[in-house]
Amino acid sequence: MDIFRLLTRGASVKKDPKNKNIGDAVENAKASNIEKNDKIAAENQITKELDFFHNKRIINKVNYNKAKETHAEDKEDKDNDNEEDEIKEEESLQYQKPLITNDEEAKLLRKSNKSNVSGEDIPLPIGSFEDLITRFSFDKRLLNNLILNHFTEPTPIQCEAIPLALNNRDMLACAPTGSGKTLAFLIPLIQQVINDKDTQGLKGLIISPTKELANQIFLECIKLSNRIFLDKKRPLQVALLSKSLSAKLRNKVISDKKYDIIVSTPLRLIDVVKNEALDLSQVKHLIFDEADKLFDKTFVEQSDDILSSCSHSSLRKSMFSATIPSNVEEIAKSIMMDPVRVIIGHKEAANTSIEQKLVFCGNEEGKLIAIKQLVQEGEFKPPVIIFLESITRAKALYHEMMYDSLNVDVIHAERTQVQRNKIIERFKSGDLWCLITTDVLARGVDFKGVNLVINYDVPRTAQAYVHRIGRTGRGGRSGKAVTFYTKEDSIAIKPIINVMKQSGSEISEWMEKVSKMTKKEKELVKKGRAHSERKQISTVPKIDKIKRKRKLEMIQASKKRKAIETKETE
């Protein structure tokens, strides 16, 4: 679709006596449309999305051509003339100078965006996507895809990360959840693949800790690379390294040079590389999304193997996350060449659009009562995500909530990928109101419009807390996060209170009086041992539990006696 057609969709023009034909066509339209068009024309205003290039004169001219085409569809020759006029307008378009042209303007923008950027020889940020056209010869097809998907202004992280990547700089980037980090690395990656169109084979590699996040990144990449051809016959190819694709690569059904960009989880990628089914030596752009997770003790060896396999001399490395612990910063310094550090807001803070709340429940039974109170008081507004610390507890809460006639389902690592995908689709479409899960869905997955996140169990670290509550308050929307805690969580909630303070959340008087964490407490939190083992989730009274246990023991004893008697008879 022509970018100017998109920009002028639904626009109208003033009636001009000189343009009698158009005036007559407008007069013949419905009265409601005439009134609407006259009002828009009289106000002579162009919306922010339509005035993408900040050039009303050109857009008004395109509006004129669009109106002429709309009201003379039956005349083919006029249609052709209009298209030619639009092409001429595009060719004659003179882009304005970039909005950020010097260090002083960059300083003001960074102050406004709360951006903290450190490193050597830092390029200027962008103030709009128009800057990309003037500074980097940005591909118009990619720009068109951005507009089609309603991305009209760069977010703070995109303002910094995109020019850094296009200048081939290594970077460590930290920005709040829902702030547009995925686009911050996808936009420059696609542009760099286009720039390197003469080279065939894998150029960009994106690593994600979970299958759900990898799939989400893949879908976003597909949207942005839609209808982009590197030559007349070869489209820009993006792949998600799934189980089936891995098998095809191993069996040589598909050439490892077919794809330009691959998105994968670490273990699956390493398996394919070790089987010599995929060559990473020509990868020029390596991106770690959720870097704090990919470089913790669970994934660090796998991430190191991937780094070793990407041996290109001009490899560009990027790390993105909502939280950056000090150990990840040290790793970044050791593996990157002259890196730039980008922090939007505070590196341990949550999204400021999320209302955060701590609720004392006394004990495990109190948590179930607290959920029922949220429902009764009207605060349980779907869609809702509830996080628990283990699969066993997630299953138990699911069975409890089923009896309350709530539209609920559960996702955890024991469910198959097909089951997980179906549940996620149901949740995204609104068929499912409440989703119970473990930390498997705490990172990166973008659920539009989640109103409430409940931490049924206190997260083990501040980083886990930030990522969990980051499932709400995304893309400029507001959200709410409620964390239940008991007396056993007295140490575990201290990092949560710190995050709330750094995020500017409303703090109760008792929170101000909470003592700072001791060295021993910090060590316990770091190891995930800040609270004792939790009791089983159940609404069944204690006396009934004892009766059930005795009954079960009696049944088992009876079965055992029968087995012995049968054996003696034989």
UniProtKB/Swiss-Prot annotation:
Protein name: ATP-dependent RNA helicase ROK1
Keywords for this protein: ATP-binding, Helicase, Hydrolase, Nucleotide-binding, Nucleus, Ribosome biogenesis, RNA-binding, rRNA processing
Similarity comment text for this entry: Belongs to the DEAD box helicase family. DDX52/ROK1 subfamily.
Keyword match ATP-binding: yes
Written domain comment of the UniProt record: The Q motif is unique to and characteristic of the DEAD box family of RNA helicases and controls ATP binding and hydrolysis.
Keyword ATP-binding: yes
Ranges spanned by the short sequence motif Q motif, renumbered to the chain: 131-159
Reactions catalysed, as given in the entry: ATP + H2O = ADP + phosphate + H(+)
PANTHER family on file: ATP-DEPENDENT RNA HELICASE RHLE-RELATED (PTHR47959), RNA HELICASE (PTHR47959:SF15)
Positions of the UniProt region annotated as Disordered: 69-96
GO biological process: one example: snoRNA localization
GO cellular component: cytosol; nucleolus; small-subunit processome
Binding site for ATP: 175-182
Organism of provenance: Vanderwaltozyma polyspora (strain ATCC 22028 / DSM 70294 / BCRC 21397 / CBS 2163 / NBRC 10782 / NRRL Y-8283 / UCD 57-17) (Kluyveromyces polysporus)
Function, as annotated: ATP-dependent RNA helicase involved in 40S ribosomal subunit biogenesis. Required for the processing and cleavage of 35S pre-rRNA at sites A0, A1, and A2, leading to mature 18S rRNA.
InterPro entries in alphabetical order: DDX52/Rok1_DEADc, DEAD/DEAH_box_helicase_dom, DEAD_box_RNA_helicase, Helicase_ATP-bd, Helicase_C-like, P-loop_NTPase, RNA-helicase_DEAD-box_CS
Annotated Acidic residues bias: 79-89
Membrane-spanning ranges: none
